[in-house]
Amino acid sequence: DDDRSLLAWLDQLIRHGLSRLRNTPATEAFLPELIRRIGPIRATNFGELFTVRARLADEGDADSTAYTGLRLGQHTDLPTRETPPGFQFLHCLENTVAGGASRMTDGLTVVDELRRRHPADHEALTTLRWSFLNRAVDEEHRWSGPIIDHAADSDPLPLTLRAFYPVRAFPLMDPADQPRAYAALRRFSEVAHDDRFQLSSTFRPGDLVGFDNRRVLHGRDAFEPGAGTRVLQGCYLDHDDL
């Protein structure tokens, strides 16, 4: 309820791309009330709000790996859109599982490491285009672009990282360029999963994490969905609404 605390949290989110609140009310009403104080929630095919929990036990096969206990590699959400959501917020309502730690990687650091140490891979990642596809139960979304998408070649920001699971990304380029494109994608994954560039933490009920979805890659460790409960509520907000 304190505007100064909210401003400080949002200032950190803009500056660093990642910010956390602790000990917030672990209720379904809290997240939408808070985010709507900032701006309109960005609706997607998941709705305005979505709940991340393992569904295999009670709803049959999950239509997204997020709804399982599988490990999720570092990625950004919805590169299948012309403009992926600017910010993502995840609010922990319950967590009694072993494992499932959250992992965050600053994409600016990844891009800088690639530019300095692997310039050929960086060039391929910023120029060669991929097609990104997501097929849900009743709809499909597709967009194309480079993995590292700068608004201007000379500026680190604005930046859109289109980091997606390889099974949902397909080369949209001359076949002669595909070997170096896949080699660069493997290099990108190696750097994004380097422990030096990751922050790891375990969600506790009441934790609320906000991060820049076009800059920060997120993932999680595996957990056993039948041994406890892990429930996160999430939503998106566009950059120009903050």
Task: Locate the predicted segments by residue.
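Active-site environment of non-heme Fe oxygenases that use a 2-His-1-carboxylate facial triad
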Residues: 1-18, 23-24, 28-242
